[in-house]
A protein has these predicted regions:
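N-terminal lobe/hinge region of extracytoplasmic solute-binding protein
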Residues: 53-101, 134, 199, 495
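Structural transition elements
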Residues: 295, 327-361
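Alpha-helical secondary-structure segments
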Residues: 125-132, 158-164, 202-203, 232-234, ...
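Detector for C-terminal structural segments
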Residues: 24, 312-339, 377-385, 407-520
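Aromatic- and charge-enriched surface segment that lines or borders ligand/interaction sites
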Residues: 97-140, 156, 162, 298-299
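Gly/Pro-rich hinge or "lid" segments in bacterial periplasmic/extracellular proteins
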Residues: 177-228, 234
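Surface-exposed binding/hinge segments that line
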Residues: 104, 111, 145-186
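Ligand-site clamp/hinge motif
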Residues: 223-268, 395-397
Length: 520
């Protein structure tokens, strides 16, 4: 393992700290970044331009097919969401100016703003919201599972939306602040054009200058109810799959905000970029999806999953591949959240010998083989993952997957395990994304009666302190049963050119709201 990590140091220029946008600074000298300008001077704050890069184009802009992550920069600009998550990570009003739950937590009522309009000028009504949610609920896609407990969505009047639940869903307001909560125009949702040019009520519209798959140009709607909260008149989102090419774009001024790696920090600061460090923005996790053993029977055995957890030298991964911008962990939950339990750290120390013994006890003395998707997430980590698992007897074959199909590689059920970056959302949201039968990261729909009861207890608990204790029990179960193999939390370093500021202090959904302007 250590020898592979030593060799892997040569790969660090290609390592991305998160699943989000990655922009590297080269080791050659770079010129000072240019401020946003027009005709040779800094533009007024309201006329500034934001230019960022993403590694993959959106697979679709259909509300029922939206993916979170880098694609959010685009769709969250086109669509309003019912609620929003601020730069401190808290759920706040947005298109819905208020919301309330019934006493039994099975009815959520939202009140819409009165000044919502689609980009074409038509008013947004509760009927539009209900229609969008009902379509998402009935359409296969990443968002469908998040509405699994919804039994109906109604609009008793133009400004009221009522969501009925079969049982409490502690993450529902969080979902409605992200892709699940977008508002589409039901009259156009079924149109083929929605995949590329959807009708939304968000603060931006896609300009005719957009070249699908290459660059998405967003122009601010000054008639939007919240236009003043978006300081950039124009936002350009370039698709640049190669991380070194992203650096070149940053250096050349083609983009004016991007991620940098720790070794380039001083160089970036010397070149005039402002650096913002955000701690624990994601968790690098080997998702052991096939816990039912449908593709790889060995993964159904807890001893095998525990052995996999012992295969990784987490300290060395952080040191060599994350260049110290991270910390080892065996948990998938946010270290600043309710579910995190520091006492669980150290459950799986690096111990290949013990891992091999566990495999033998499980009936696999000679190990086994499995195929995993090679994605924009896994690329730089593949040599380490391959060698670590080979050292305990597990042979991994990597199958290339196009960047735009990264999410589909999880839901396809073709792969027993997937290397993934978990976004460190609220505990309930992480459970909904990873562990419920409908969860995106649980494609084989694994269940366990003991775990199901624990999740139900969490959902039914209204007291926040008591619920936090239950969340910790959830984390303990996931660690002891080795449902996945978390490796490390990773942070990010944002580099912004003069005139642009990165705002969040914690991990939040990547949207245009995370950027502000500086200077007069």
């Amino acid at each position: 393992m250590v020898s592979v990590l030593s060799r892997a140091r040569s790969l660090t220029r290609a390592v991305s700290a998160t699943v989000a946008v990655a922009a590297l600074l080269a080791t050659t000298a770079c010129s000072s970044p240019s401020p946003d300008s027009s005709a040779g001077g800094e533009a007024p704050p309201r006329d500034r331009e934001l230019r960022i890069a993403v590694q993959a184009q959106p697979a679709s802009l259909d509300p029922a097919q939206l993916a979170e992550g880098q694609q959010s920069y685009i769709w969250a600009s086109i669509f309003d969401t019912l609620l929003t998550i601020d730069n401190e990570g808290k759920v706040q009003p947005n298109a819905a100016e208020s919301w309330s739950y019934s006493e039994d937590l099975r009815t959520l009522t939202l009140k819409l703003r009165s000044d919502l309009k689609f980009s074409g000028g038509d008013p947004v009504t509760a009927k539009d919201v209900a229609g969008t949610l009902e379509r998402t609920r009935s359409t296969p896609g990443q968002q469908q599972s998040k509405l699994a407990r919804v039994t109906s969505v109604s609009a008793p009047d133009d400004s009221t939306v009522v969501i009925q639940l079969s049982e409490p869903e502690p993450s529902l307001t969080n979902y409605l602040a992200q892709a699940t909560g977008v508002i589409g125009d039901p009259d156009t949702l079924a149109a083929e054009t929605t995949k590329l040019r959807p009708a939304g009520s968000g603060p931006y519209i896609l300009s005719d200058a957009t070249v699908d798959g290459t660059e998405y140009v967003l122009e601010r709607r000054d008639d939007h109810w919240n236009s003043k909260a978006f300081p950039f008149k124009t936002v350009k989102v370039r698709v640049i799959a190669d991380r070194t090419a992203q650096f070149n774009a940053l250096q050349a001024g083609e983009i004016n905000a991007g991620l940098v790696q720790p070794p380039q920090r001083k160089q970036a600061e010397a070149a005039g970029f402002t650096i913002k460090e955000v701690d624990a923005t994601a968790a690098l996790v080997l998702i052991l999806a096939d816990r039912k053993g449908e593709l790889v029977p060995a993964l159904a055995d807890v001893k095998v999953r525990q052995a996999i957890n012992m295969a990784f030298d987490r300290e060395q991964v952080v040191k060599a591949l994350m260049q110290g911008l991270g910390r080892p962990t065996v948990q998938v939950f946010n270290p600043n959240g309710d579910a995190y339990n520091s006492e669980l750290e150290g459950t799986y120390d690096f111990d290949p010998e013990k891992a091999r013994k566990l495999l033998a006890e499980a009936g696999y003395p000679d190990g086994f083989s499995m195929t995993m998707p090679s994605t924009v997430i896994s690329g730089s980590y593949e040599p380490v993952i391959t060698q670590a698992l080979a050292d305990i007897g597990i042979k991994v074959t990597w199958e290339p997957v196009p960047p735009q199909n990264t999410a589909a590689s999880v839901s396809s059920r073709k792969y027993p395990a997937v290397l993934w970056f978990s976004g460190l959302n609220a505990a309930g949201r992480e459970i909904g994304d990873m562990y419920t039968p409908q969860a995106f990261l649980n494609p084989f729909k694994w269940q366990d009666p003991e775990f199901d009861k624990l999740l139900q207890d969490v959902a039914n608990e209204a007291d926040e302190e008591a619920q936090a204790d239950l969340y910790k029990k959830v984390s303990e179960y996931t660690v002891k049963q080795a449902l996945n193999a978390p490796i490390a939390y990773t942070g990010t370093l944002w580099a912004t050119a003069p005139g642009v500021e990165y705002l969040p202090k914690v991990n939040v959904l990547p949207t245009i709201r995370t950027f502000g302007v500086t200077g007069g």
